[in-house]
Amino acid sequence: MSAKQIVFSTDARDRLLRGVELLNNAVKVTLGPKGRNVVIDKSYGAPRITKDGVSVAKEIELEDKFENMGAQMVRAVASKTNDLAGDGTTTATVLAASIFREGAKLVSVGMNPMDLKRGIDLGVAAVLAEIKARATKVISSSEIAQVGTIAANGDAGVGEMIARAMEKVGNEGVITVEEARTADTELDVVEGMQFDRGYLSPYFVTNAEKMRVELEDPYILIHEKKLGSLQAMLPILEAAVQSGKPLLIISEDVEGEVLATLVVNRLRGGLKIAAVKTPGFGDRRKAMLEDIAVLTAGQMISEDLGIKLENVTLDMLGRARRVLIEKDTTTIIDGSGDKASIQARVSQIKAQIEETASDYDKEKLQERLAKLAGGVAVIRVGGATELEVKEKKDRIDDALNATRAAVEEGIVPGGGVALLRAKSALVGLTDDNADVTAGISIVRRALEAPIRQIADNAGVEGSIVVGKLVDGRDHNQGFDAQTETYVDMIKAGIVDPAKVVRTALRDAGSIASLLITAEAMIADIPERGSPQSTGNGAVDSMGY
């Protein structure tokens, strides 16, 4: 085991604080509508340009091990906030740095760090409750568009596109963001269920121009196992021919002889048919087949259920208004399943999501839920260069996450105003222990940090903005950094999702209060000749 270096007390907190400040300085420049971009070097390809706080935080690794501990703790705040709320990472970083900075000062003059932590926890809890109480529900499409616009740094086109997508697929529907092959950003809404399996043979294609299979009002055979026996299939194939309707086969696989026969029948024009493989793997494959069965009012043909293929009749098959099959995707549009059955299936999946502890299982269940609940919308991001597309994609991802959070918990005035106004929850909140009361004051001061930073990034003195807003009585009044005017934030459409604001403060308070209580730090002794062994590396030149 290698020898360790140990630092204590004020030295430990100072080193932690230097690391926190370095990370904070790199991240905070991106905050607000006039926030700047950060250029990140990549080991391959061109550098990346981003205004996404968590992307910046994830790139930061410091040479000094003790400073790096501080930076990594705050980086964890940004990552956790991003995971839970999908946005607000820069706000969380600024809040955490402010709380730790003020706390470290008070500990250095003799206050008890554990009592300060208690005070911070009390203050944060009071503010979280206040923000939740002040949140207003998002109902209209225009409100959803406002949230998306703010999160996309004032890009109204992005906000409106997200609102349109949510209108089409519902609040629980899947909205994905991918890179387009053109310079335009566009929304493509897939009504119905889409899964990532395409046609088994290009000979099934009915639209040669678009290279896809288009089946109108087809029957859908949902089979759990491989189809290897042509004899067993004959009764259902004959019934399909007599009905005059197309037939879609969804099964684990179709063996060579059977597939060849289906293709020959398709080419001769006797049978409009197509076959695709079942989506998913393992147990999920069976669950997805059951989802398709519910959506199309069909039965899953499984020998486990005592249903043999040769005994299958047309009334056991699913139905849909239209099916589109491309090389890699199958889309079932307007299945015949009744709403009550689909809703019962949705409720069942929601219950499974609540029960599962695995993040992977949860993600897969949510995908199934979204497919059943409302279909899929795809936002294809275009741009003149690859760098522009990636930067825009970051912003749209943020906007999409923020919009989902707004629908979930409602909205509050944006631009740091909600946190500033929530200071009212701390009025009269004190404790018999002076150090606990000082901890509450740390939170009171930190609530001003985001709005100060937004103003600073716009080239305006933050303390003047805060002073003017504190003097005003209108709870919705705030500073519009884009126009550098004081406006009613709700009416101006400058809003934040309550969930994003609450998550940012909760995570920042949690990590920062723990950093304050650090009394010793342990790390490997740096090798001789490394920058750490001669001092603090590049940090000294930055004036800390």
UniProtKB/Swiss-Prot annotation:
The keyword Zinc appears for this protein: no
GO cellular component: cytoplasm
Enzyme class: isomerase
GO terms of molecular function: ATP binding; ATP-dependent protein folding chaperone; isomerase activity; unfolded protein binding
Database matches in HAMAP family: CH60
Catalyzed chemical reaction(s): ATP + H2O + a folded polypeptide = ADP + phosphate + an unfolded polypeptide
Originating organism: Rhizobium meliloti (strain 1021) (Ensifer meliloti)
GO biological process: protein refolding
Residue runs in coiled coils: none
Subcellular location field: Cytoplasm
Quaternary data: Forms a cylinder of 14 subunits composed of two heptameric rings stacked back-to-back. Interacts with the co-chaperonin GroES.
Location, primary (coarse class): cytoplasm
Domain of life of the source: Bacteria
Gene from which the chain derives: groEL3
Function: Together with its co-chaperonin GroES, plays an essential role in assisting protein folding. The GroEL-GroES system forms a nano-cage that allows encapsulation of the non-native substrate proteins and provides a physical environment optimized to promote and accelerate protein folding.
Keyword Cytoplasm on entry: yes
The enzyme's E.C. designation: 5.6.1.7
InterPro entries per the UniProt record, alphabetical: Chaperonin_Cpn60_CS (IPR018370), Cpn60/GroEL (IPR001844), Cpn60/GroEL/TCP-1 (IPR002423), GroEL-like_apical_dom_sf (IPR027409), GROEL-like_equatorial_sf (IPR027413), TCP-1-like_intermed_sf (IPR027410)
SUPFAM superfamilies: GroEL apical domain-like (SSF52029), GroEL equatorial domain-like (SSF48592), GroEL-intermediate domain like (SSF54849)
Entry keyword set: ATP-binding, Chaperone, Cytoplasm, Isomerase, Nucleotide-binding, Plasmid, Stress response
Pfam families xref list: Cpn60_TCP1
Residues binding ATP, per UniProt: T30, L31, G32, P33, K51, D87, G88, T89, T90, T91, G415, D496
Name of the molecule in the record: Chaperonin GroEL 3
Protein family: Belongs to the chaperonin (HSP60) family.
